[in-house]
Amino acid sequence: MFSIIQNIEKEQIKKNIPVFRSGDTIEVKVWVIEGSKKRLQSFEGIVIAIKNRCLNSSFTVRKISNGEGVERVFQTHSHGIEEILVKRKGLVRKAKLYYLRTRTGKAARIKERLN
């Protein structure tokens, strides 16, 4: 039974996902359907959490839009994601950056990882 589930999950998993970690600034291009139109929408922000659960893997991206914090959770292997681009690598010491929710301005900055 378990091997059947694993075989089905292997077929569904995307292979072209770049390596990124918490603290990285990424741009996610997502297909959005509005009425009968289908277009690509870009969402750029800092990765504040990653959950690795095989096919149920997800990551949370946070950005500031018009002074308001906006968070969006993406399923890593979703068919709605066209591509993920890593813009900047961040230097952080925690896996979950939920403390950024309470910080604004310069306090919410993350140092860049140079390697």
Swiss-Prot record:
InterPro entries registered for this protein in UniProt: Ribosomal_bL19, Ribosomal_bL19_CS, Ribosomal_bL19_sf, Translation_prot_SH3-like_sf
CC terms in the record's Gene Ontology section: cytosolic large ribosomal subunit
The protein's name in its UniProt record: Large ribosomal subunit protein bL19
Record keywords, A-Z: Ribonucleoprotein, Ribosomal protein
Keyword set includes Ubl conjugation: no
Biological processes, Gene Ontology terms: translation
Classification via Gene3D superfamilies: 2.30.30.790
GO MF entries: structural constituent of ribosome
The keyword Cytoplasm is annotated on this UniProt entry: no
Function text: This protein is located at the 30S-50S ribosomal subunit interface and may play a role in the structure and function of the aminoacyl-tRNA binding site.
Residues in the signal sequence: none
Annotated NCBIfam families: rplS_bact (TIGR01024)
Domain of life according to the entry: Bacteria
Protein family per UniProt: Belongs to the bacterial ribosomal protein bL19 family.
